[in-house]
Amino acid sequence: MLFYYIQRTAKSIPQIKEIGSLVCQKWGQPLGNNLWGFPGWSKLSKVREEDFRKLKLGYRAKYVHDVAQVVGDDPFYFSNISQLSYDDAKSELIRLPGVGPKIADCALLFGANKTEAFPIDTWIAKVLDSHYGLESFTYSQKALFARKHFGLFCGFAQQFLFSGERLGLIKSK
């Protein structure tokens, strides 16, 4: 999951899917029916940064390469992350190259079952700003507000807010 989220700040979803498919085809295992598995960080740790760049990763190629160097030798890295508290897991992920608070929250919510993670993108920020008056709040302050307001499962609330905003179901004030 983290591989895809590292790209998220610079690419559209179709571009991310395309790059993911290219990476899987180039370094992953064939699964049949023209499908390929994700190669894993261990395999990606052997890929040169230039080879990532050739797949249209742009400046994110360095981050993917550097993360692969850090986690590629530890097959338990992400399972160990999921065993940590939310705060400790987030702190650990943010230490990785190219991983900031939003990417860490996405990886924790969708990849480590940390339901208290509340990723804030422009859609979520718009909802929080217009409905809760949080325009002057930082990312961390908005995320803390969400955890207190929506509780331990605020990550689920985030999904409803995101979908509602994207579908035009949430009326702006």
For every predicted segment, state its role.
Residues 1-173:
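HhH-family (HhH-GPD) DNA N-glycosylase catalytic core used in base-excision repair
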